[in-house]
Amino acid sequence: VRATFIHGVRDVRTGEKAAPERTGDEVLIRVAGVGVCGSDLHYYLEGGIGSAHIHAPFIPGHEFAGWVTEDRPELGLHRGQLVAVDPARPCGHCEWCGRGHVNLCPNVVFTGAPPHHGAMTETIAVAPEQIFPVPEHFTVAQAVMLEPLGVAVHAMDLAKQRVLETVAVLGCGPIGLCLLQLARRAGAERVYAVDPCDYRAEAALRLGADRVDASHERIDEWTGGRGCDLVLEATNAPAGFQIAVDSAAIGGRVIMAGIPDGNAYHLDAAQVRRKGLVIKFVRRMGHVYPRAIKLVAAGGVDVESVVTHRFPLQEAGRAFELQTERRDGAIKSLIVPQERFE
């Protein structure tokens, strides 16, 4: 089968790999779409994230959906059914799984995170517990976007937003735009967004932001010097942590969902202490796919419009470059290994 491989920094090629064979109760999925995520860009530009280094050639891709290849009545699945796939397969037995923190499982098998190959291929085998059937009216894009939406839902669980709080969203990429919509839905009095990219700022306004600017310094002006009760950071900027702290009110909360370039932040620690901030970092997601599906099905979150570009498998390199350079209106690019189930 065909697959997209990262061979090195900014070196993406399409090639062949052995067709997957299912073992045990696994299900074979024909991949319908794979999102290019910010973490994929870190593998592409830096060869890894922190201590997680890829061993080239590496198949990326963890945001994906596809069609079931055969009837599996014992699982309630039928051939040709569109399903979303949770990339995480936690062990279910460790201390952290036992506490309900499956997203922190140290034994997790995570599709598309080293050393485990991802879904930018034509066919993949996954465990039944990773599969979430979607309503018949769902598009492939909506099914794929359940993964980044799930991360945003998990972030909001950590945030514990209260009604009529002021919220700042830093970074209006796919996860930032999902966070913005969730904050609005949760009853924020004002939602302010910050992004230096014009078309992302326009998307933020369209999806519910009250005000948007390229600089976080406008938040001080908009809030009369108070800052925001809740700051949702979703950038790749090493300055993102400091900007979030600057934007937060005394006693506020900061939720860090972004991954910085170079895997390092710079921070004025005294400012954090003096403001008495509560800071939480987002690690993937818990068991949130069912809620994410309900949100999209009910029209509570628009994920369809976040997907701006589609590329066939052999043009994955173009998608990576487009997202890296943030041009041509690219917010979320989708790699489409095949247009239809056959």
Please place each PLM-identified region on the residue numbering.
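Mid-domain Rossmann-like dinucleotide-binding core that forms the NAD(H)/NADP(H) cofactor-binding site
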Residues: 78-80, 138-217
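Residues in the short beta-alpha loop(s) of Rossmann-like NAD(P)-binding domains
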Residues: 196-197, 260, 285
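NAD(P)H dinucleotide-binding glycine-rich loop of Rossmann-like/cofactor-binding domains
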Residues: 91-170
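C-terminal hydrophobic helical "lid"/dimerization subdomain
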Residues: 1, 242-246, 286, 290-342
